[in-house]
C-alpha cells in the first residue's frame, strides 16, 4: 500500500506515487497540469479536461509490471462506458420475498372466524414440505419430554425446600376474623411478609428451573463426549473423503461493517489458502459484503481486497461489494447477496468478521450437506482463540473447556431442530432464499421494525419449512474471537439483549416448531434472568427488613395458650444451598474430568487446567453480580425504548482505562457498599449470605481494569494458565491469520478518503470500483419527472374543461 509515502501535494509528488521507472517519470515531468498528465497516461486524446482523470484509471491500475488485473481479465466497462474493476460476478437476480409477520393471535382468530382468512403467503418455486418421519424426530421428542420432567421435578422439590426455609409459614400470623375489624394499614402490615414470600418463591422457582436446564444440558453433553456413542451426530453422515460434485458450489460470505480491516482480510486470506490446500478451491467463491459507511475504512477495504487478490491470485474467486443503502443491517446484507448471486450457489457459508475456518472443515460441511439432503443448516461449534488480555483468555478457556459439554448437550436434546448462531455455519441456499427472508416486525416502538438478532429466526423459519437444523459439535477447524474486556462484551450483550427480546414477539407465530419456540424463550431468559435475580435479592432484603423491624406477634387470639414462634430450618437451607452450588459448578468440574480422561496436555497438564478452572470459577463469581446489574439495565432500556447502538465490536486487544471503569462501574460500587451497610444494620449474620454479591459489586472497578490487561494475559499464558489447545499447538490457519494481521497492520492504509482523492493509485481504484448506478438513476428521475409533468398538465386541462 502507499501508506509509507506522504500524501501528494504537488504534481511532482503525484508522479512519485506512481510505480514507474525514472525514465518514465522524466518523460512525464514536463506536464504542467494534471489534465495533461492524465491525458498522456491514458495515451489517447481527451476532449473534456474534467474527464482526464477518469481516462487514465486503467493505466494507473496496471502500471505495476506483470499486473494480474489484465491477465485475469478483471478490467471491464460499466453502463456509462467507464472503465471498471470486475469486483463482483455478473448479477443473476433471484426473487427474495419475505412473508409478513402475523404476530397477533387475536387478529388471526378473528379473521378465521369471519372467513376472511390470512393474507396469502409469497409464492415459491416449490411449496414448504414436511420431511418423512425420521427416527431422530421421535427420539428428540421423547428426550425433550424427559428434560421437561427433570427440570420441573427438580424445581418442585427445591421450591418445597425453599418454602420451608422462609420464616412465615401457613399465614399463621394473619387472623381472618380480625381483618374486617382493623385498619387497612394494620392488614397491609400483616399481609406484607406473606406477599413478599410468595413473590420470592415464584422468582426462585423460575430461576431454579433455568439453572436446572443448564445442568441437565451439560450433564448429557458430558455423557455424550465421554462415551462417544452418539449415533445421531450429523458429522457421522459422511465418510469425509467423498469427492464434491461440480455442481455443489458454495459461497463463503463475510458481511462486515466498519471493521478492523487488517484483521478481516488476514482471516479471509488464511481461510482462502486453507481451502486451496484441499484441492477443492474451484467449488468455492469468497464474498466480502461491506456495509461500511466510514469513508476511510471503505477505501482501506478496497485496497485490502485488491492486495489479497494479488497475493493469493484470487481474482475471480474473491469478490468485494459495498452497499450504499444499509437496509436491515446484516440480514439485509445477506438478502442483497441472495437476491443478486444466490441462485448461482447450492450452499452458503456465513462468516463473521473475526471468523477463520479451515479448508477441511469447509469441505466437510459441504460433504455433510450432500450426504444429508434434508438438512437446511449445519452449525459448527466455533472455538475461541486469538486474544491476549487476561479477561479474553479466561473467557477463551471457559468456552473451550465448558463449551463442548453444553454444545453436545444442546445437540442431545434438540437433534435436527437446533440452534443457528449466525456465523461459521453452512446453509442450503434454495430453501433459505424461499423461506428465510425476514420482514420487519409490525407496529411501532422498540420491539418493531427490522429484526436485530436474525439467526434464531432464520433457523426457526428453516425448520418451519420442513428442513433440519443441526449442530456439528465435534467438527474441528472453526474459530472465532471474543471481546477483549468486560465492557466490550457488555456492549455486545446490549445488542443481543434487545434482539432476543424482539424475537420473543414471534413466540406465537403460526407454524413455528415447539423447539424453536423454546429457543425464543431461552433467548429471552438469557437476559431476563438478570432482572429476575436482582428483584429476588431485593425482595429478600425487604423480607429481612420486615422480619427485623416489625414487632413480632406471638399471640393472635385473646385466650391463646401457646405462642406462634417464627420457624427456621437451617438443615433445609444448607441442603438447598448445596444443591444450587452443585447445579452451578458441577458442569465445570465434569468438563475438567473429561479433559483428564481425554488428555490434558493441550491445556497445560492436569494440575494447570484444574488451577485454571478454580481461578475461572472465582472470576465468574466476581463478575456475575456485575453482569446482573448491566443486563437488568439493558432489559429496562429495551422496554423503555432506549435505542441500542449497533457498532462493530472491538476486535483487537484493548485495556480498560481507570476513568472509563469508574464511569461504568462507579454506581455499582456505591450500590454494593450501601447494600452491605443496610444488611449489616438489619442483621449482621445475614451479610455472610449476601457477601458474594456486595463484595463483587464493590470490587467491580479494579476487577474490570486488571482483567483487561494484556501483560497479565501473556504472563498467564507463559505460565500455562488458561491455556487452550489452539495456543499449545496452533493450527496453520490461526498461525497464518496472526502473521497476515501483523503484516497488514504494518502496511495499513491511513487517511483513506484523502488518498482516494489525491493519491494516483488509490484514486484509480476508487474510480474503478465506483458504479454508474447514479447515471441510470438520473434517467429514471427524468422519466418520473416528465411523466408527472404530463400528468399535471392533463389534470389542469381536464379541470379547465369542467370549469368551462
Curated annotation (Swiss-Prot):
Membrane topology type: Multi-pass membrane protein
EC number: 2.4.1.-
Primary localization class, coarse: membrane
Keyword Membrane: yes
Pathway: Glycan metabolism; osmoregulated periplasmic glucan (OPG) biosynthesis
Gene Ontology biological process terms from the UniProt entry: glucan biosynthetic process
Listed transmembrane segments: 146-166, 200-220, 519-539, 576-596, 610-630, 686-706
GO molecular function: hexosyltransferase activity
Record's GO cellular component terms: plasma membrane
SUPFAM superfamilies named among the record's database cross-references: Nucleotide-diphospho-sugar transferases
One Pfam family, short name: Glycos_transf_2
InterPro entries on file: Glucans_biosynth_gluTrFase_H, Glyco_trans_2-like, Glycosyltr_2/OpgH_subfam, Nucleotide-diphossugar_trans
Residue ranges of coiled coil: none
Keyword vocabulary terms for this entry: Cell inner membrane, Cell membrane, Glycosyltransferase, Membrane, Transferase, Transmembrane, Transmembrane helix
Subcellular location: Cell inner membrane
Membership in a protein family: Belongs to the glycosyltransferase 2 family. OpgH subfamily.
Annotated function: Involved in the biosynthesis of osmoregulated periplasmic glucans (OPGs).
Name under which the protein is recorded: Glucans biosynthesis glucosyltransferase H
Protein species of origin: Pseudomonas syringae pv. syringae
